[in-house]
Curated annotation (Swiss-Prot):
Gene3D superfamilies xref list: RimP-like superfamily, N-terminal
Cell compartments where the protein resides: Cytoplasm
Family to which the UniProt record says this protein belongs: Belongs to the RimP family.
Gene: rimP
One Gene Ontology term, aspect cellular component: cytosol
Pfam family, one: RimP_N
HAMAP family linked to this entry: RimP (MF_01077)
A GO biological-process term: ribosomal small subunit assembly
Designated name of the protein: Ribosome maturation factor RimP
Domain of life: Bacteria
Cytoplasm keyword on record: yes
Gene source species: Aliarcobacter butzleri (strain RM4018)
Amino acid sequence: MSLEESIKLTVESLGAKLYDISTLREHDKNIFRVSITCEGGVNLDKCAEISRMLSPILDVEEPMNGEYLLEVSSPGIERKLKKVDHFLASIGEKVKVKNFATEVFKGELICADEEKIVIKTEFGNEELTYDNILSAATYFEW
């Protein structure tokens, strides 16, 4: 079983869903970030509970070389969309999508399936297949 599968099983056993795993460097510190979602929202107690359960797993199978901080959090209101499930869960939200031709499409995600998405932009509906998407994220208008 891979580390990601172990993390996913642990997160799901505690009533949450694994959204994403990322590694990054902030303020000269390595961070292993586990983003989760929960029905009803993610709270601090749930993050702490999952962190406590993941810590022994990560002690055995280190996710990064050297010292790192484990961070368990929600993906936030403005989050990256990387998987089909992310797009499916974001239907009805505002998204910003960049394709490989570096065109940027902003608008409401009105449809998503296993092959493509449809964004309602100010210029009309734009259909994009996943293999044409360079990056995508939800965004919030204040």
